[in-house]
Amino acid sequence: MKISIITATWNSGATLRDTMESVLSQTYPDIEHIIVDGGSLDNTMEIVRELEPQYHGRLRYVSEQDKGLYDAMNKGLKMATGDIVGILNSDDFYTNEKVLEKVSKALDNKIIDAV
């Protein structure tokens, strides 16, 4: 079961590295991370490009003006190819490396329907 994580950004250079590294640290193997940037004026996209090689093809991103957070999230949803879609804000991060693995198992075992 593939998991798509969508992160909308705008001038998130101060926090995005922690967000991306928390996705990279996940033990669940079938993840794509989609970053939709609203045309940041800071170093947001430099961080994305710097960390891109560590994703080994599992990172997709776009940087262009949008109409705000929900427009960015909708763009991310259109780009997503996962069976499960999650939202991770650009100033949030997963507190441990097994979060997505646990979510996947809970959904597979019908313990939960949504998170």
Regions inferred by a protein language model and the residue ranges of each:
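N-proximal low-complexity "stem/linker" segments adjacent to membrane-targeting elements
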Residues: M1-S25
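Acidic helix N-cap motif at the loop->helix transition within catalytic regions
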Residues: A14-R17, D42-L51
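A conserved acidic beta->alpha catalytic loop
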Residues: P29, D37-E46, N89
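Catalytic phosphate/metal-binding cores of nucleic-acid and nucleotide-processing enzymes, i.e., regions
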Residues: Y61
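Glycine-rich, basic loop-to-helix element that forms the pyrophosphate-binding segment
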Residues: E64-A80
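Acidic metal-phosphate-binding loop of nucleotide-sugar-dependent transferases
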Residues: K67, D92-Y94
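Short aromatic/hydrophobic "clamp" motif used to bind/position activated sugar donors
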Residues: V85
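Conserved donor NDP-sugar-binding/catalytic core segment of glycosyltransferases
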Residues: E97-V115
